[in-house]
Amino acid sequence: MANHDPISDMLTRIRNASEKRHQNTKVPASRMSRSIAKVLQQEGFIAEISEEGEGVHTNLVLELKYSGKHRLPTIRSMQRVSKPGLRIYKNTRGLPKVLGGLGVAIISTSKGVMSDRDARKQGVGGEVLCYVY
């Protein structure tokens, strides 16, 4: 079955694994999924990124993070913003602050995929891929 929106698929896999308290989840590897996973790791939402398989069948294995003795997921919500049918672009001043700065907006810019904070520091705008908090 063809996957028409790999970013939504990645976010859904992470969200479902997190809600079910799985240790890790597998996501089909691509440059975009690697970039998004790196931003999630830098922002403290996932613990570890590794790859398995080779060639076309390479998967990213994302080790999820939990907090406290009840293992509450660090990812409370993930929302896709810009979709294939409706792309959302923002300039530097228009970049959203998720939950007043507690969450992260992941932005695809001309300088690569980065968090909203990094995009503001570098003075670039771009496509708002998703919100994570």
From Swiss-Prot:
Cystine connections: none
One Gene Ontology term of the molecular function aspect: rRNA binding
GO biological process, one term: translation
Matching Gene3D superfamilies: 3.30.1370.30, 3.30.1490.10
One Gene Ontology cellular component: ribosome
Highest taxon listed in the record's lineage: Bacteria
Keyword Chaperone applies: no
Entry keyword Ribonucleoprotein: yes
PROSITE patterns named in the record: RIBOSOMAL_S8
Keywords noted in UniProt: Ribonucleoprotein, Ribosomal protein, RNA-binding, rRNA-binding
Record-stated family: Belongs to the universal ribosomal protein uS8 family.
Function field: One of the primary rRNA binding proteins, it binds directly to 16S rRNA central domain where it helps coordinate assembly of the platform of the 30S subunit.
Assembly description: Part of the 30S ribosomal subunit. Contacts proteins S5 and S12.
Protein name: Small ribosomal subunit protein uS8
Species per Swiss-Prot/TrEMBL record: Synechococcus sp. (strain WH7803)
UniProt gene name: rpsH
